[in-house]
Amino acid sequence: ALVLLAFQVQADPIQNTDEETKTEEQPGEDDQAVSVSFGDPEGSSLQEESLRDLVCYCRTRGCKRRERMNGTCRKGHLMHTLCCR
């Protein structure tokens, strides 16, 4: 399912008020948070539960600690790494 995600990701800045992210390095010009969409408007409850707290970034230089690579994403016409935690 996450491989499918790589082709459907659209860049969309997201603000996170989580205390953990305040102490970590914030996304800069090279990193953008993205929203995740699977195309099925109804979705499945299992899918919704597992993705509820998923935060992904489209990164140009690879994933940071506590993130894992979940595919690729686009910024304009360039492909980058999709990193989620």
Curated annotation (Swiss-Prot):
Signal peptide residues on this chain, from the entry's feature table: 1-11
GO BP, sorted A to Z: defense response to bacterium
Pfam families xref list: Defensin_1, Defensin_propep
Entry GO terms, CC: extracellular space
Disulfide bonds: 56-84, 58-73, 63-83
Subcellular location, record wording: Secreted
Function as written in the Swiss-Prot or TrEMBL entry: Probably contributes to the antimicrobial barrier function of the small bowel mucosa.
Protein name in the entry: Alpha-defensin 14
